[in-house]
Curated annotation (Swiss-Prot):
Pfam families the UniProt entry points to: Mqo
Keywords: FAD, Flavoprotein, Oxidoreductase, Tricarboxylic acid cycle
Name of the protein described by the UniProt record: Probable malate:quinone oxidoreductase
Cofactor(s) the protein needs: FAD
Catalytic activity: (S)-malate + a quinone = a quinol + oxaloacetate
Pathway(s) this gene product operates in, as recorded in its UniProt entry: Carbohydrate metabolism; tricarboxylic acid cycle; oxaloacetate from (S)-malate (quinone route): step 1/1
Any single GO BP term: tricarboxylic acid cycle
Keyword Nuclease (UniProt): no
EC number: 1.1.5.4
Family: Belongs to the MQO family.
Keyword hit for Oxidoreductase: yes
Length: 492
């Protein structure tokens, strides 16, 4: 027998995006009936899980791929500014949630971890110096430090400097109030709070099998624990299911989804098992990506706090896969090819063969080869103290392109229906770090009339003090907001 339920808001996927949107909507209108559907037995088991993502509070401080050097030698910083301002919005919301007791102690999900970029060789040192000069001239990056002094770098990153050839020039930048974020813990806390509110339902072990718009959205699902069909009628649907989002978006048949495809990329970490080594490193040290590597593969020696315990990771090592989820099917990629996106998929595949070859090469790397990559960052690394652990899946966006048929894009994108009744988040990187501004975009697209009301405007400014203003343009606002969030989240 089919069970049925009615809901105002249906969130598909129990990750950080759905948890953030559900929390925002509940704070804006506590009367809304909100239902969250998750395939697994618990929320935050895929890309939001601590072991499945970089955990970096992506603020553009250390990620060199956000500021690639132009042919003329200049270093454009516009993308880094945008990402930094976006992360500041996330920090503001989290700080407010801590103040209200919705999130527990900040250390339960976010911890101060300096963000550093590290390079070696004359050419790379010159690039990092230019990058620092360009960024530090802007108020968002005014606190960024730079040094070529090995003694200073020894203090910032002792593991990185120990045993290094002193004849090779090195340089590093550092922002002391960078952060490590356990998005799994953050997601679970947000969902736990929603579970205590009237009108919220969490349906785990439920698989969405179809959705069709007939006035409201008619969503078909299966309760996997009982093998029973479920029908859900929803006024608004958000697809935030990570790699499963694209197939669900295709099932929706909205016009705006035409032409979109996905390119799955897997990830792996080298994880240290020696507590003495782990406690000697306290930073996220990012380097330059190898030639041909996708941006989510920028190598870094990474301090993490996962489920309250310190960890030390190096990677990620990307790889080629046909799965869209870590626990997905090998047929995911093939099944995603439709008549509406065939041209896009073929065009992107034809023009990105170098990336495919790179990813396949990464898959067949030996442990010794991965250790050699690690020793660029930790010269004295002992092979016996590190092992390989699988990370999460990323499905990069493929879009229609007039000149190439299709193009591969690295980033995130909101796709929404013309009537605002459905929205989906595609892509990855910077991903979870910008969950708040990403979900604000969903509100702007799909709840525009309500968002313009005096009540919602007032509530938004309470939750995000910089709402409606530009942190990129307003230095005084940035200083005030940053002082408050860093203090409230105990990042300084």
């Amino acid at each position: 027998m089919t069970s049925s339920l009615d809901t105002d808001i249906l969130l598909v996927g129990g990750g950080i995006m759905s948890a953030t949107l559900g929390t925002l909507l509940h704070q804006l209108n506590p009367e809304l009936r909100i239902t969250l559907v998750e395939l697994q037995a618990e929320v935050a088991t895929e890309s939001s899980d601590g072991w499945n993502n970089a955990g970096t509070g992506h603020a553009g401080y250390c990620e060199l791929n956000y500021t690639p050097q132009d042919a003329d030698g200049s270093v454009p910083i516009a993308r880094a500014l945008k990402i930094n301002a976006a992360f500041e919005e996330s920090l503001q919301f989290w700080a407010w949630l801590v103040e209200k007791g919705i999130l527990r102690e900040p250390a339960s999900f976010i911890n101060p971890t300096p963000h550093s970029s590290f390079v070696w060789g004359e050419k790379n040192v010159a690039f990092l110096r230019k990058r620092h000069q360009a960024l530090r001239a802007h108020h968002l990056f005014a606190d960024m430090e730079y040094s070529q002094d090995p003694a200073v770098l020894q203090q910032w990153m002792p593991l990185v400097m120990a045993g290094r050839d002193p004849s090779i020039p090195v340089a590093a930048t550092r922002v002391a109030y960078g952060s490590d974020v356990d998005f799994g813990s953050l997601t679970r806390q947000l969902v736990q709070h929603l579970q205590g509110r009237p009108g919220f339902k969490l349906l785990t072990r439920h698989a969405v099998t179809g959705l069709k718009q007939q006035g409201s959205w008619q969503v078909k699902a299966v309760d996997l624990s009982q093998g029973k069909p479920v029908e859900i009628r929803a006024g608004f649907v958000f697809l935030g299911a990570g790699g499963a989002t694209l197939p669900l978006l295709q099932k929706s048949a909205i016009q705006e989804a035409r032409g979109y495809g996905g390119f799955p990329v897997s990830g792996q970490w080298l994880v240290c098992h020696n507590p003495d080594v782990i406690h000697q490193h306290h930073a996220k040290v990012y380097g330059k990506a190898p030639l041909g590597a996708p941006p989510m593969s920028v190598p870094h020696l990474d301090t993490r706090i996962i489920n309250g315990k310190p960890a030390l990771l190096f990677g990620p090592f990307a790889g080629f896969t046909t799965r869209f989820l870590k626990r997905g099917s090998l047929l995911d990629l093939v099944n995603s090819v439709k008549r509406s996106n065939l041209k896009s998929m073929l065009g992107a595949g034809r023009h990105h063969m170098d990336l495919t070859r790179y990813l396949i090469g990464e898959v067949f790397q030996s442990h010794q080869q991965r250790m050699a990559a690690l020793r660029n960052f930790y010269p004295l690394a002992n092979e016996s103290e590190w092992s390989l652990v699988s990370a999460g899946q990323r499905v990069q966006i493929i879009k229609q392109c007039e000149h190439q048929g299709g193009k591969l894009e690295f980033g995130t994108e909101i796709v929404s229906s013309a009537d605002g009744s459905l929205a989906a988040l595609l892509g990855a990187s910077p991903g979870a770090s910008t969950s708040v501004p990403a979900m604000l975009e969903v509100l702007q697209r799909c709840f525009s009339p309500q968002l313009q009301s005096a009540a919602w405007q007032e509530r938004m400014r309470e939750m995000l003090p910089s709402y409606g203003q530009s942190l990129i343009e307003d230095a005084e606002l940035l200083r005030a907001v940053r002082y408050h969030t860093l203090s409230r989240l105990k990042l300084t």
